[in-house]
Structure formats: C-alpha cells, structure tokens
Amino acid sequence: MATINDNYLKLKAGYLFPEIARRVNTFIEANPEAKIIKLGIGDVTEPLPEACRTAMIKAVEDMGDRSSFKGYGPEQGYGWLREKIAAQDFQARGCDIDASEIFVSDGAKCDTGNILDIFGKNNKIAVTDPVYPVYVDTNVMAGHTGETNEKGEYEGLVYLPISADNHFVADIPSEKVDLIYLCFPNNPTGATATKEYLKAWVDYATANDSIIFFDAAYEAFITDESLPHSIYEIEGAKDCAIEFRSFSKNAGFTGTRCAFTVVPKQLTAKASDGSQVELWKLWNRRQSTKFNGVSYIVQRGAEAVYSEAGKAQIKGLVSFYLENAKIICEQLKSAGFEVYGGVNAPYIWLKTPHNLSSWDFFDKLLQTTHVVGTPGSGFGAAGEGYFRISAFNSRENVEEAMKRITQAFKV
C-alpha cells in the first residue's frame, strides 16, 4: 500500500486562514443578511495599476501573433524583467545585486516554502513568535520538526518571542541557529527594522555560518527614509542572506501572481562532506527542475511596475492603503485599544480588550460587528491576546468597520 508523508499529520487542525473562512461561512449561513467586512487575510481590493493592465493587454496581443508569440520562457524569469528589478529595487539603493541573482516566481509564499528543498534536514531553525504561519508549517511538512508541546510550539524549532516589551523585534539568540526567518515590515505585527538592527543579525549570521531568510514582501510600505528596504543594504548580507519579494501588495498582484527571490552567487552552505556549495546553483537547479516560469503576460505586467507611470500608480496604491492603516489606528486608539503597527506597514496589531483570548475576540467581533480580523494566536503562542487587522480594503469598508467597532467596544 502507498504511504503518506507522516509529517503532514503533525500539522495543527487547520491552516489559519482556512479556519477563519470556515467560521465566517458558518456565520453567513446562519445570518445571510449580515454585511461582512473582511479585514483579515491580507488580500488587496483595488484594481491593478493601469500601466500593468495596459502592458498585459499588449502581451496578450503578442501571444496572438506568430512573430511575437512566446512559449516556454526562462525558468528564472525573462532578462528584461530581472534587469529592471536589479537596477531599480537594488542597485538604486546601493545594493550590489546582479540580474542573474534574481529568480522570478509566482509568489513569495511559494518561495519561502520551496527554499527548504535546497537545505538539509538537520539545520536548527529560528522563527519569531508570533510569525507568518507558512514559515512554520512548511518546516513541519519538510520533516524539520517534532510534535507540538502544550503551548502549540513545535519541537525542534527555536522560537524568538516578540512583544511590546521588545518593540516586536526579536532579541539576537545566544545559541547557535542555522536558518533564521526575518520579515520586515513585519507580518503580523507591523514592526519595522532599523539598519543597526539588521546589521546585528548579519553579524550574528556571519559569526555562526547561518543563513537569513529575509521576507521583504511589504517593503513598498516603508515611508521612513532611515529604514532599509532590503537586507542587502547591510554590509556583509550577500554572504549570509536570501531575500524574498512580491508584487502582490504594492502592485495588487495577489490574483495575478508574480514575485522574486534573490540568491547571491557568493552565498554558500555546507555539504555533508564539509565542502562549501553555492546556493545559487542549487536554487537554479531546483527551479529548472520543478518550475516552468511565470507566464510571459504576467511578467510584462510586472515589468510595467518599473515604468514612470507604473511607479506613480503604485505610489498611489501604497498611499491609499497606508491612509487606511492610519484611519484604523486612530479610530481604535480613540476607542481605547492598545494598538501597534500601521506605520510603514499595512497591518495593525492590537491587544484584545478585557483579557479576551484571540479567538474569543474574533468570534465576538464577528457576531457583534460583522467585521473579520485575524486572531493573533494563529501566528503563534506569543500572539495569544493579540489581533491583526489588515488595511487592505476599500476606504468605505474601512470607515464603516471602524464605526462599528468603536460603537461596539469601549476599552
């Protein structure tokens, strides 16, 4: 008889967002007239920028003409897109990243999980707590953890707690770890990292032969000029870090699917025989074997992000969502909530009122205001007692949601 990957049986009952959807759907079935406002999953609501739409329409026409038709493209992405990414996202900020070190993909979520394919099973892995659940669950699936303890933590992972006490940025661990997940601006807390803070991590990784997985999916929301957008703005990071980026939140590509991962060619890790192996070669081999590349049409849309019109339109989109975040923060604070994030980030992280658990507050919010957010405990044990609200929605919905919440709750 065929056997399964038993590691999947270690996973908790449901991935966070499907569980939210299940509860919301159950509520809707019982209350079909309720107008639900979803500020939970970080999905965008505003249309694709005109520059991207125009480029994609032209690309569709290209596919209808024999002379410009495109079949399989390079697994790593078309050169014209990779060159623009390298020049405008990295070289313009003083980062020595070459186009050949950029791998275009269909999502940062996919890449942060798939990157584990090129690493061994005996690495000691560190994640913050709370944390984006994909980092943990993909390690469970890959067999890098044991079972969960009474707190819901997986054996074999090193959890780095983040809270108001440390401004939601983890302390550098005293023990040696091999792989480190960092996300800034942070999902779920909205915290940001200074250059000095990232330099401390780069120094730690260099001293311990560690690799940093740096998720910069929300870097476009940084408005503070003193804050780094890329870990490669830090000296030495090319020797110890892989960076993940996405067009999902800045350009509204959540349903279009395009992202990229940066693997510097000088980055190495150790083989079982002790030799140093270039990770670029392994990732290139992995992508060439398991991935056929992002569609030509979508990549043309992503290329338009870097046009003058595209940059202006994306700036407008980002500003729109940041204004939503500002409204959410101001309204919740006026009602007495303890609020974090929402500046340089599209997520607001709040303390649940009256000592409610994260899921109890979720249910109460849904039942009384018909507003959906994300329970902090779904991001880890240290997220218990917190709640995430997303700024990704229409202005009308955000204002209505805040009106409902502030009328229903006085903290």
From Swiss-Prot:
Note whether Transferase occurs among the keywords.
yes
Amino-acid positions noted as binding pyridoxal 5'-phosphate in the UniProt annotation, renumbered to this chain: 72, 108-109, 132, 187, 218, 246-248, 257, 292
Q: Which GO terms describe its molecular function?
A: L,L-diaminopimelate aminotransferase activity; pyridoxal phosphate binding
Pathway this chain belongs to: Amino-acid biosynthesis; L-lysine biosynthesis via DAP pathway; LL-2,6-diaminopimelate from (S)-tetrahydrodipicolinate (aminotransferase route): step 1/1
Q: Which family does it belong to?
A: Belongs to the class-I pyridoxal-phosphate-dependent aminotransferase family. LL-diaminopimelate aminotransferase subfamily.
Q: How does it assemble?
A: Homodimer.
What's this protein's function? Answer: Involved in the synthesis of meso-diaminopimelate (m-DAP or DL-DAP), required for both lysine and peptidoglycan biosynthesis. Catalyzes the direct conversion of tetrahydrodipicolinate to LL-diaminopimelate.
> Which protein are we looking at?
LL-diaminopimelate aminotransferase
Protein species of origin:
Crocosphaera subtropica (strain ATCC 51142 / BH68)
Question: What is the taxonomic lineage of the source species?
Answer: Bacteria, Bacillati, Cyanobacteriota, Cyanophyceae, Oscillatoriophycideae
